[in-house]
UniProtKB/Swiss-Prot annotation:
Protein name, as recorded: Cytochrome b559 subunit alpha
Gene this chain is encoded by: psbE
Classification via InterPro entries: PSII_cyt_b559_asu, PSII_cyt_b559_asu_sf, PSII_cyt_b559_CS, PSII_cyt_b559_N, PSII_cytb559_asu_lum
Molecular functions per Gene Ontology: electron transfer activity; heme binding; iron ion binding
Any one of the GO CC terms: chloroplast thylakoid membrane
Record localization: Plastid, Chloroplast thylakoid membrane
Length: 83
């Protein structure tokens, strides 16, 4: 015989008005907040990733590829200086 944990059944939760009032506000709010986070460019600043127009500069049109195993730090410094 299984015991009763005292939790509310899931069917009761998703059929309640209170559940839908709360989630009809929070789910679209999270979607809008995420869209604004990305569309304003704040995501690029927070995570430090380059913006689409910063991948290639006028002076450097080739891919910044690290080729040396032992001088990789110098190559990274060279790439960042050219930015």
């Amino acid at each position: 015989m299984s015991g009763n944990t005292g939790e509310r059944p899931f069917a009761d939760i998703i059929t309640s008005i209170r559940y839908w009032v709360i989630h009809s506000i929070t789910i679209p709010s999270l979607f809008i907040a995420g869209w604004l986070f990305v569309s304003t460019g704040l995501a690029y600043d927070v995570f430090g990733s380059p913006r689409p127009n910063e991948y290639f500069t006028e002076s450097r049109q080739e891919i910044p590829l690290i080729t040396g195993r032992f001088n990789s730090l110098e190559q990274v410094d060279e790439f960042t200086r050219s930015l």
